[in-house]
């Protein structure tokens, strides 16, 4: 994402002690530094985004819709739009953060393309998914109430065309405690290597712990199968971050 906005700022939101941290919010301050924050916090993020573009080239079909659910600043939307060769398609990018939506629209408008994009400020749980050849949940599901996750995946499955794909990227938890601890610590090392201090890491973690509730790969796969997807697999992973593909059967 960092190549989309030459004016993006370095993330120093948590560099000094904050008395009342509260819960994490995707507000104006976060939106302003988001490209830098996500590059330095999520291992493999830029790879996932560029490969989402490659997947769009394979899966997006003519006369269909593409959904980017929890689009933030539109990195996945732009990657998909650059790679879509099918005609008469539309991308619907949704986020519930006004600050993200405003900036996302500016990013989208900065690039010309044959494929129209509609950026909507809304709760993704209220979006009607229809005639979709591709749906992206890029580090979004983990911020939903766990009770709402299965229902959303069910609606995505129902709204996908046969042969359509869901890309689900998440931070993972692990049933094996030793593996979980190792990957947690390696992610900590990753952030430290990217210039974050112990104070920044701990303050951000405190704000996220009540808001971002992660699942294991096994839980994700189980939910996706329960929704109706027959073809489900992890296609990318770096430490405790990764992405799954769920493909709706061509004859379903």
UniProtKB/Swiss-Prot annotation:
Its EC number is 2.1.3.-. Disulfide bonds: none annotated. The keyword Transferase applies. S-adenosyl-L-methionine binds at residues 45, 70-72, 95-96, 123-124, 138, 205. Keywords: S-adenosyl-L-methionine, Transferase. SUPFAM superfamilies: S-adenosyl-L-methionine-dependent methyltransferases. One of its GO terms (biological process) is tRNA wobble uridine modification. It comes from Photorhabdus laumondii subsp. laumondii (strain DSM 15139 / CIP 105565 / TT01). Belongs to the class I-like SAM-binding methyltransferase superfamily. Cx-SAM synthase family. It catalyses: prephenate + S-adenosyl-L-methionine = carboxy-S-adenosyl-L-methionine + 3-phenylpyruvate + H2O. The keyword S-adenosyl-L-methionine applies. Homodimer. This is Carboxy-S-adenosyl-L-methionine synthase.
């Amino acid at each position: 994402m960092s190549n989309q906005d030459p004016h993006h700022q370095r993330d120093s939101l948590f560099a000094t002690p904050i008395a009342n941290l509260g819960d994490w919010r995707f507000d104006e301050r976060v939106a302003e530094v988001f490209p830098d924050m996500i590059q330095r916090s999520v291992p493999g993020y830029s790879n996932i985004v560029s490969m989402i573009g490659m997947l769009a080239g394979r899966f997006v079909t003519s006369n269909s819709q593409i959904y980017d659910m929890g689009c933030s600043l539109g990195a996945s939307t732009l990657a998909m739009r650059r790679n879509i060769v099918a005609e008469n398609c539309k991308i619907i990018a949704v986020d519930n953060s006004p600050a993200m939506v405003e900036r996302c629209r500016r990013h989208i408008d900065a690039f010309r393309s044959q494929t129209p994009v509609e950026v909507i400020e809304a709760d993704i749980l209220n979006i009607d998914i229809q005639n979709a050849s591709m749906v992206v949940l890029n580090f979004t599901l983990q911020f939903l109430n766990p009770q709402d996750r299965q229902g959303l995946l069910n609606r995505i499955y129902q709204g996908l065309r046969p042969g359509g794909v869901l890309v689900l990227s998440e931070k993972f938890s692990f049933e094996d405690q030793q593996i979980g601890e190792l990957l947690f610590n390696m992610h900590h090392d990753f952030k430290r290597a990217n210039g974050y201090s112990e104070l920044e890491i701990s303050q951000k973690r405190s704000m996220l712990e009540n808001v971002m509730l992660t699942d294991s790969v096994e839980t994700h796969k189980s939910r996706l199968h329960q929704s109706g997807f027959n073809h489900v697999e992890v296609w990318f992973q770096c430490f405790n971050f990764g992405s799954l593909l769920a493909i709706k059967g061509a004859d379903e």
